[in-house]
């Protein structure tokens, strides 16, 4: 009887632990958006190509496992705002072609309620500054979304706010990110 109980217990333990095993999740969709507010128009932009390291994450019973570090790079040539003339001005104000990208390298990632608290260095226009943001983690239909947003000030990165008809855009830029992970 003890032997049967032991075999059943071992079977249940192995069955339960196989459900807890990690599964590789690959980045399937990467979105990086920015918003600049001008007195005459709110400009929404997007970066069409975002490079992220690592490209594979692990999941387990508690959701996505905390990565040791994350590096994100957004090539400036991929920034689009819906107006080619404005896009060329954005490139110029971000120091293109001398600066080829906007980049972020994490310095710490900690678990917080519903996600991660991510700290790191953001480099824009050749200027690197520390930033901190919350990355929200949500799960839906077998995929996991990592998303969040934060604000920067143009002056902190030696960027002059654009002006139109003698009115300048607000100093603040909202940066929004969303990354979809799938098995």
Model-predicted regions and their roles:
Residues 2-9:
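Sec-dependent signal peptide recognition
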Residues 15-18:
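N-terminal signal peptide c-region/cleavage motif recognized by signal peptidases
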Residues 20-183:
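Low-complexity, acidic/polar, glycine-enriched regions of mature
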């Amino acid at each position: 009887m003890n032997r049967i109980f032991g075999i059943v217990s071992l079977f249940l333990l192995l069955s339960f632990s196989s459900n807890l095993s990690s599964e590789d999740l690959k980045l399937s969709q990467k979105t990086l958006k920015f918003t600049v507010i001008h007195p005459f128009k709110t400009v929404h932009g997007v970066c069409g190509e975002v490079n992220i390291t690592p490209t594979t994450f692990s999941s387990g019973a508690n959701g996505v496992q905390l990565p040791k570090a994350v590096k994100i790079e957004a090539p400036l040539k991929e920034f689009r705002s819906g107006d080619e003339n404005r896009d060329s001005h954005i490139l110029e104000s971000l120091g293109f072609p001398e600066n080829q990208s906007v980049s972020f390298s994490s310095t710490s990632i900690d678990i917080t309620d519903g996600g991660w608290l991510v700290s790191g260095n953001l480099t824009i226009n050749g200027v690197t500054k520390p930033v901190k943001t919350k990355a929200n983690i949500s799960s839906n239909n077998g995929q996991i979304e990592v998303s969040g947003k934060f604000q920067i000030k143009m002056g902190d990165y030696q960027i002059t706010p654009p002006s139109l008809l003698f009115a300048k855009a607000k100093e603040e830029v909202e940066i929004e990110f969303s990354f979809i992970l799938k098995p």
